[in-house]
Amino acid sequence: MASERILELMRRPSTAEEHDAIRELWKTHSKAEDNRDIAGLLSTLTRDCVYTVAGTGARWEGHEGATRFYTELLTAFPDIHFELDYIVIGPQGVCEEAIVTATHEARWLDHEPTGAKLTLRNAIFFPWDPEARLFKGEMVYTDLQFPTG
C-alpha cells in the first residue's frame, strides 16, 4: 500500500497553468546551470531545499548546501555538459535524463581527480513545492563509476 506522502503526490491536481509554471522554472534552472549562475539557480529553489546523490549518502541542505553542491560539482567538473535525453513534467515536479560529459579535475564525493574525460547518464528528479512554486532540490541518480585502483 502506498504511503500518505505518495498518495498526496498521486492526487495532486494537474492544470495547464501549473504545468507551464513548472516547465518555465525548470528552463530558468537549466539556463542558470549552463551559465554557472549560482544566484539564478538558488532563485528556483525553496530555502529548505535538499540535494542528494543516490547511493552515496551525500546530502546538501538549504541554499547554503545547494551553493556548496554546485560549487563542488562545477569545480570537480568545470566543463560539465548536460545533453537532455528525456523529460517528464507533472504536478509532482520534473524528472529528466541526460547524457553528461565532463572532465574530472577536482575532488568529488570522496573521489580524487582522475583527469578522465567521462560520459555518463544521470536521472534527476526536481520535486515541486506547489505552495512556494519552487523546486525542493534535486535527487540525482547516476551511473558514474570511479576507478577503484
Predicted feature locations:
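Short, low-complexity N-terminal intrinsically disordered segments enriched in polar/charged residues
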Residues: 1-47
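A solvent-exposed, acidic/Ser-Thr-rich amphipathic alpha-helical stretch
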Residues: 7, 19, 38-91, 99-104
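Short solvent-exposed loop/turn micro-motifs enriched in small/polar/acidic residues
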Residues: 24, 79-80, 118-121
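Hydrophobic alpha-helical segments typical of transmembrane helices
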Residues: 25, 37, 69, 122-124
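Short, solvent-exposed coil/turn segments at beta-strand boundaries
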Residues: 41-44, 90-93, 126-135
